[in-house]
Every structure is written in C-alpha cells, then in structure tokens.
C-alpha cells in the first residue's frame, strides 16, 4: 500500500492510457494509504477541472436560442459543481505543499471560476511570492 506506487499506477491509467475512471481508482487508493499525498490530491482535483473543461466545450457549441439558453444554464451549473468539487483536493494539496506553483495556480483558477475572488487574489499573491523567492 505504498502511496507513490499507487499514485504512479493511477497516473499511468489517467494520462497514458486515457482511462480516467481507473486513474481515479488508484489516486483514491493512494489517498487511502496517505490522505495527505499531495500529488494524488492535485491530480484528483485536476480531473474535476478537466471534466469542467469538457462541459465548457459543450457550452461553446450551443447556438443562441431559447432552448440552447436553458441547456447552457444546466451546463453552467454542472461546470460550477465540478469546479467546486476540485477545491477540497487542491486546498489539501496546498496545505501539504504550500510552495507548489502548479497547485497554487490551479487553486487560484478554481477560486476565480467559482467566483471566490478574495480567495483567488490571496492565492495569486502567494504564488507571486513563491515565484519571486525562486528567482
């Protein structure tokens, strides 16, 4: 039950084999082995973001008609729900590794897209400080 081993299997399924469900299964197993495993937390959150991006693609294909407006509103609600689901994973990954730029950027973006502007600005400032420190 080595979390690194389980994470790596999840990553291979998710990214190399494009089997998201199997990737999730192994990311979750990694998180059972170590609930604070930052990489698995990040990737689990990223899957929600990827799913929300797929919803946005569907939204962008809609025409400008009354029926399409109703469908757009349904999809927008789904998109926001997916993004909200990513937040706890990114927040926990951030707590475990507060100087990881990818996590900070993902958290900022999800806060922004879920209209949590104060949180987005706070995380942006933190990311800017980390970037400045690494120069």
Whereabouts are the PLM-identified features?
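Short coil/linker segments at helix-helix boundaries
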Residues: 50-89
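Canonical positions in the second alpha-helix
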Residues: 29-30, 93, 127
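Residue-level recognition of tetratricopeptide repeat
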Residues: 1-2, 37, 100, 134
């Amino acid at each position: 039950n080595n979390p690194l081993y389980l994470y790596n299997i999840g990553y291979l399924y998710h990214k190399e084999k494009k089997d998201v469900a199997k990737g999730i299964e192994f990311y979750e197993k990694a998180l059972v082995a170590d609930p604070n495993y930052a990489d698995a937390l990040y990737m689990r959150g990223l899957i929600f973001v990827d799913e929300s991006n797929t919803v946005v693609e569907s939204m962008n294909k809609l025409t400008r008609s009354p029926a399409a407006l109703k469908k757009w509103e349904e999809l927008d609600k789904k998109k926001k729900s997916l993004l909200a689901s990513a937040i706890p994973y990114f927040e926990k990954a951030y707590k475990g590794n507060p100087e990881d730029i990818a996590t900070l950027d993902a958290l900022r973006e999800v806060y922004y897209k879920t209209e949590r502007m104060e949180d987005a600005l706070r995380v942006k400032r933190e990311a800017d400080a980390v970037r400045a420190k690494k120069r």
